From Swiss-Prot:
It comes from Bacillus cytotoxicus (strain DSM 22905 / CIP 110041 / 391-98 / NVH 391-98). One of its GO terms (molecular function) is oxidoreductase activity, acting on paired donors, with incorporation or reduction of molecular oxygen. GO terms for biological process: tRNA modification. HAMAP family: TrhO (MF_00469). Residues 127-221 form the Rhodanese domain. Catalyzes oxygen-dependent 5-hydroxyuridine (ho5U) modification at position 34 in tRNAs. This is tRNA uridine(34) hydroxylase. NCBIfam families: PRK00142.1-3.
Length: 324
């Protein structure tokens, strides 16, 4: 029997009415700090969306307190074991929206949302004819892992998704639409918006990718790569039956599942790259970012101007060989 790890990472959300998000956020931060949790929780009039880490005892106390609050009756926690905290600090912040769609006429998932499919139902539906699977996440999340055959909307943020759908409406019309995201919260609104836009057969993966990966029956099957998560783990496994790497190194296009942020603080783009290429390319996504005066990789490793110049010269020489 596997030894259980001492920490837990909680992922949860609930659409429910919170009358005063600012006041609730301040009080909730105090409560989380009293339990010594770390994480990021968003609070809005429409509900709560959070991920937090702590010891087994700390997270149990938190879940119990939340479930005992009438506003959060029926809340579902997705729980991962961990060796330590998944966050450095604890943040609880009030927001106008739990997920940023910025629609002129907002969607209330309690009134309008797509049909919920449990993991086994979603697994079967993906394989049916005339079905289109849409990834409701951002492009860098898709690049690390996704359901086999899923469409990748070329978007940098969730609020760009409705426009992408409108631009590609002719491809989607008349099809069965399945959509999914990490934990389910984005699809609650997105699938509701699709229904309102006139798409008739819209379903969503209940509980998201995280729930799908833990399901004892499907065991994450038909998922390729890993699931991007917004904490220090960055990636978590999903498919328990096989591991297919779909991520590609930014510089060499070789299989890669290691994300870093571009060392230019004004860019900060997330790129997949090996440790070797991180060093070789000064953790920068482009030449402009490599020579940026505030390149963090250069500062962290205290590289001299001569060392930087030598690295740039080597890259340029290799590029010339490729072109030649």
């Amino acid at each position: 029997m596997a030894i259980k790890k001492p920490y837990r990472v909680l992922l949860y959300y609930m659409y429910t009415t919170i009358e005063n998000p600012e006041e609730f956020a301040a009080e909730h931060l105090q409560f989380c700090n009293s339990l010594e949790l770390k994480g990021r929780i968003l609070v809005a009039k429409e509900g709560i969306n959070g991920t937090a880490s702590g010891t087994t005892e700390q997270t149990e106390k938190y879940m119990e307190a939340m479930k005992n609050d009438p506003r959060f009756a029926g809340i579902v926690f997705k729980v991962d074991e961990a060796d330590g905290h998944a966050f450095k600090k604890m943040h609880v912040r009030p927001r106008s929206e739990l997920v940023t769609l910025r629609l002129e006429d907002d969607i209330n998932p309690k009134e309008l949302t797509g049909k919920y499919l449990e993991p086994k139902e979603f697994y079967e539906a993906m394989q049916q004819e005339e079905t289109i699977v849409i990834d409701a996440r951002n492009d860098y999340e898709y690049d690390l892992g996704h359901f086999r055959g899923a469409i990748k909307p070329e978007i940098k943020s969730f609020r760009e998704l409705p426009n992408w759908i409108k631009e590609n409406k002719e491809v989607l019309e008349g099809k069965k639409i399945l959509t999914y995201c990490t934990g389910g919260i984005r699809c609650e609104k997105f699938s509701g918006w699709l229904v309102r836009e006139g798409f008739e057969d819209v379903s969503q993966l209940h509980g998201g990718i995280v729930t799908y990966g833990k399901d004892p029956e499907v065991q994450g099957e038909l998922w390729d790569g890993q699931c991007y998560v917004f904490d220090e783990r960055i990636a978590v496994p999903v498919n328990q039956k096989e591991h297919v790497i779909v991520g590609r190194d930014h510089f060499t296009n070789e299989p890669c599942e290691r994300y870093v942020n571009c060392a230019n603080p004004e860019c900060n783009k997330q790129i997949l790259c090996s440790e070797e290429n991180e060093a070789k390319y000064l953790r920068a996504c482009s030449h402009e970012c490599r020579v940026h005066p505030r390149n963090r990789y250069v500062k962290e490793h205290e590289l001299t101007e001569e060392q930087v110049a030598a690295a740039l010269e080597k890259i340029e020489a290799e590029n010339q060989v490729k072109l030649g």
